[in-house]
Amino acid sequence: MKILLATDGSESAHSAVDCLMRFPFPSDSEVTMLTVIDRAVFKNEELTDLNDEQQDALEETEKIVQEAAQELLEREAARLRNAGWSESSELRIGHPAEEIVAVAEQLDIDCVIVGSHGMGGIKRFLLGSVSDYVLQYAPCSVLIAKEPGLLPNESGETPTSPADDKHARPLRMLLAYDDSVPARQAVEFCTSLPLDQQAEVTALTVLPLITLYRQDIRQRLSWLWLEKKKQALAALERVTKEIGRATPHVEAQLREAADVSDEILHAASEYRSNLIVLGHKGKGAIQKFLLGSVTTRIAHHASCSVLAVRNH
């Protein structure tokens, strides 16, 4: 599997590296580390009328920033090498979000990993800018890495580092499933991962209710609704059998709610999930609306990492 890991030196990006090392990617995966220097910092329209001294200072600053970015790449790459990963690195200058998507296209990447917020000292919130753009336009799956906090292990002790945490708790995956083509692709992605015997997977389907004027009461009693529930349960049964080949700890949940994304978030909190997986809807106008109403909302509000799967 080809993985692109975008880093900017922020704590969030550092957590993305931790997430990569804890995530059950195939051991022969190839990782490309990418750092993008925002061209706008040095190509600002207000910086056009500079004297020679100011221009020299700007060029020196740009050189220092590039050297710092290269050092950052080398540090993070060393972490990956020490953990046994095969890696390479890329340093680009341009618009961060656009460069991430461009590199993903050029290198035929299978999964892009970005932090949930950061941008170094600027502390710019990524969701709503860079990661939103990557989530929308990347030609592949996108993993938005978050640090959900360290959970107590079996003995009730709290790990002191992410590395210890890896051994203290299993992967707890919540797979949001609606039997669509993207959802089935998400299942295929999950079953392709080398999940260990401790991994826990909950396949969740949420049927949307129309609560206006208590229409949900009539909706629940209609034969069409009962047929939808029957079909949803059958689809969940197929999914649990597929994932059951990868790990024995699989269960299915069928829920009904007026707000699908809220119910998914509630379930993730209830199950103490450390990863939510959804099928990616794509880039079209209608699909963009769906993406904004479910996937992006979950990416914004989930307390754990979110993987939006899209085959390319």
Model-derived features with residue positions:
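A short acidic, glycine-rich active-site loop
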Residues: 54-68, 221-234
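Aromatic/hydrophobic pocket-lining residues that form π-stacking "cages" and hydrophobic walls in ligand
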Residues: 20, 76, 100, 134, ...
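Structural beta-alpha unit
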Residues: 63, 67, 71, 75-112, ...
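Conserved beta-strand termini and adjacent loop/short-helix elements that scaffold enzyme active sites
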Residues: 34-36, 90-94, 145, 204-206, ...
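Aromatic/pi-system hotspot detector in well-structured domains
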Residues: 15, 19, 25-28, 33, ...
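Small/aliphatic-rich secondary-structure junction motif
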Residues: 1-56, 166-221, 242-248, 253, ...
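Gly/Ser-rich helix-loop-strand patches that form or flank binding pockets
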Residues: 2, 26, 102-155, 159-160, ...
